[in-house]
Amino acid sequence: NGMSMGQHGVWGKGNGTFPMNMYDSAVKVPFLISWPGHIPANTVCSEMISACDLLPTILKLTGLSDKQPTGLPGRSFTELLKGEQREHRDEVVIFDEYGPVRMIRTKEWKYVHRYPYGKHELYHLVDDPGEEKNLYGLPEYKKLVTQLKGRMEKWFCTYSDPAIDGVRSAVNGSGQLCRPGVYAIYEDPFAPKGVE
């Protein structure tokens, strides 16, 4: 998984901070795969893919595409693994299932929205790959923020399950110690255990 090692003053995963962060160092995950005779060795790909793409990819690689459940996000990246071209993906939507933080990322832009209170972020990744200059709130980017937020919210309206949607979850920086929605455990994850 992604792990910040001091970038932005953060040590650990994105869901272990308050507010939760969506810096690339916390959310980007290297993906390595080997299947001699099926996938060419030493292939490097810089296309944007998501964990949602793993299921359709594995099903296609194994000849089981017809077993793909309907209504799920994600698309196969088998062509990329084989060094072939495929239609370019414009965006990847990321969410933090342990709290109300969502992000949409294109090759050029990243928009982070924290429900309900902010701090929201907008980064121009071409000019600012280290995500140091937050452009959110600048008037010249208002239309872009509206477009990115709309695309992100449309994705969640299509694919999220309201019963476990983290957008309404409390945020406390405890990472995976808390569960979203109907699976939430409302206890202090930092309280000493077995002490009266």
Regions picked out by a protein language model, each given a short descriptive name:
Residues 1-40, 50:
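Histidine-centered active-site microenvironments of extracellular/periplasmic hydrolases
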Residues 7, 33, 79, 105-106, ...:
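Conserved hydrophobic "DFG−1" position in protein kinase catalytic cores
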Residues 21-29, 95-137, 174-196:
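C-terminal, low-complexity/hydrophilic appendages and adjacent surface loops
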Residues 30, 36, 55-56, 129:
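Proline-centered helix-kink/hinge sites
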Residues 38-104, 141-150, 164-169:
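Polar, surface-exposed loop/tail segments
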Residues 54, 135-196:
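Long, internal low-complexity/basic segments
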